[in-house]
Amino acid sequence: MTNPQSAIRNPQSADGVLIIDKPSDWTSHDVVAKVRKILRTRRVGHTGTLDPFATGVLVICVNRATRLVQFLTGDDKEYLATMRLGFATDTGDLTGEPLLPVTDASHITSEQVQEALTHFRGRIWQTPPMYSAKKVEGVPLHELA
């Protein structure tokens, strides 16, 4: 790719792939916009949108490396989640309105949780929630909800 020294002097000439740990208060588009501003280039793209409240790896391609996006989007993904039992919201995340009062879930064992999680391991088909970054006709679902 680009000579690192010339990229420092002229950020617009930088080509490459950045691995960014997206914070929960940024959208994937916010990250792309920030990279565009710092590197002073419009040719910046990512390999997959993370939901607005999700944190994690966002792969960013810059300039000539944007040609690689098509080869990086089909890779398997791994998710790490934290559960709060006895609590549900209308959005399916912590920002929503509670659907019911918080209930005591202390009777649920770790074995029961592990058994329930088996349904979320491996290759699964999931219907995206309305409060997600999934786009329908170019509009994120969370904006339509």
Residue ranges and their predicted role:
Residues M1-A145:
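Catalytic/RNA-binding core of pseudouridine synthases
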